[in-house]
């Protein structure tokens, strides 16, 4: 693996499978009375969040603490950033404090890459979401969830998602989750289809390694997993569809549409979800919806990322065995 995790596109097939397998080892920690490993004891990790976050920030913090790291939570609100301090000055301040890793979420696409390559800080950089660009750990936890559900927890070890048919539905234009998932799922051998109104597809979509469709009903019977994406109104400065009701009628997933999916197929959502728009309460609360599993799996994936970037090259299971003695 590379030193930093900036983009899902940077991962090779072997990198991704190794991460998923390591996450399976980390998931076993959650089943123990004491959910703790000594792997990152003495290491300092900063969660540098310039955008609001619930799941990602808490998930990273839980992962860091389960690996025994010293954790510093930084938010732009209430810091010198609100007074006009630049990313460079913030990075140099963290460097002066000797931090070992920075988990960064930023509204500007490319900010994590800039931090990792600028020379401002000599720390591992992990992208927790940058603008509409990338969210690699979200793609990893989604792939982890798919592999567990569609292949099996034990049967999936060492395997990718070759031949699986994955459909992403909704606001592709503004979604870093969609971009990251397309990159990673393609690397893992899955067949990806994007479904959205033309106004919510980015320019240059034809160069992405996926198919594009506009009719949700025709894609559902051929899907092993359907991921519903929220319409990101906070990133919109114009009307991209007539009304919410019209959008939901054409691109929302309800019980009748879910019934068209194969029996083994799952429904996914990266959160936060808007019930009644892209997904109904009936679907969100069904056994086929993996939204809560994705949150759980996110901690295991982020533990695996932190472990592999900071902890060394030994198998994660060796640390587990040491802890259990």
UniProtKB/Swiss-Prot annotation:
UniProt-annotated binding residues for carbamoyl phosphate: 55-56, 105, 135, 138, 271-272
GO BP annotation list: 'de novo' pyrimidine nucleobase biosynthetic process; 'de novo' UMP biosynthetic process; amino acid metabolic process
UniProt-listed Enzyme Commission number(s): 2.1.3.2
Binding site for L-aspartate: 83, 176, 230
Catalytic activity: carbamoyl phosphate + L-aspartate = N-carbamoyl-L-aspartate + phosphate + H(+)
Name of the top EC class for this enzyme: transferase
Pathway: Pyrimidine metabolism; UMP biosynthesis via de novo pathway; (S)-dihydroorotate from bicarbonate: step 2/3
Keyword RNA-binding attributed: no
Record flagged with keyword Cell inner membrane: no
GO molecular function, one term: aspartate carbamoyltransferase activity
Any Pfam family: OTCace
Subunit structure: Heterododecamer (2C3:3R2) of six catalytic PyrB chains organized as two trimers (C3), and six regulatory PyrI chains organized as three dimers (R2).
UniProt function note: Catalyzes the condensation of carbamoyl phosphate and aspartate to form carbamoyl aspartate and inorganic phosphate, the committed step in the de novo pyrimidine nucleotide biosynthesis pathway.
Family classification: Belongs to the aspartate/ornithine carbamoyltransferase superfamily. ATCase family.
Protein known as: Aspartate carbamoyltransferase catalytic subunit
Organism: Streptomyces avermitilis (strain ATCC 31267 / DSM 46492 / JCM 5070 / NBRC 14893 / NCIMB 12804 / NRRL 8165 / MA-4680)
Annotated gene: pyrB
């Amino acid at each position: 693996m590379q030193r930093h995790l900036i983009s899902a596109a940077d991962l090779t097939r072997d990198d991704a499978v190794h991460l998923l397998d390591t996450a399976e080892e980390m998931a076993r920690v959650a089943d123990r009375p004491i959910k703790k490993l000594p792997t990152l004891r003495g290491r300092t990790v900063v969660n540098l969040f310039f955008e609001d976050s619930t799941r990602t920030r808490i998930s990273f913090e839980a992962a860091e603490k389960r690996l025994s790291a010293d954790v510093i939570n930084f938010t732009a609100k209430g810091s010198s950033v609100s007074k006009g301090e630049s990313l460079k000055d913030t990075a140099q301040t963290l460097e002066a404090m000797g931090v070992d890793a920075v988990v960064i979420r930023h509204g500007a696409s490319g900010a994590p890459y800039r931090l990792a390559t600028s020379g401002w800080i000599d720390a591992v950089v992990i992208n927790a979401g940058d603008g509409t660009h990338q969210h690699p750990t979200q793609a990893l936890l989604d792939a982890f969830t798919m592999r567990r559900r569609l292949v099996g927890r034990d049967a999936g070890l060492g395997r990718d998602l070759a031949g699986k048919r994955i459909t992403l539905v909704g606001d592709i234009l503004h979604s870093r989750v969609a971009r990251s998932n397309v990159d990673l799922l393609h690397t893992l051998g899955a067949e990806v289809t994007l479904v959205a109104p033309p106004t919510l597809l980015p320019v240059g979509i034809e160069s992405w390694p996926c198919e594009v469709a506009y009719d949700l009903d025709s894609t559902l019977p051929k899907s092993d997993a359907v991921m519903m994406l929220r319409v990101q109104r906070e990133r919109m400065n114009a009307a991209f569809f007539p009304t919410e009701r019209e959008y939901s009628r054409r691109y929302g997933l309800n019980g009748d549409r879910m019934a068209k999916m194969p029996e083994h197929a799952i429904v996914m959502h990266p959160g936060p979800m808007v019930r009644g728009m892209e997904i109904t309460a009936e679907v969100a609360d069904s056994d086929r919806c993996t939204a809560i599993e994705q949150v759980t799996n996110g901690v295991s994936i982020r533990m695996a990322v932190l472990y592999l970037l900071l902890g060394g090259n030994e198998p994660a299971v060796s640390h587990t065995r040491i802890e259990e003695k």
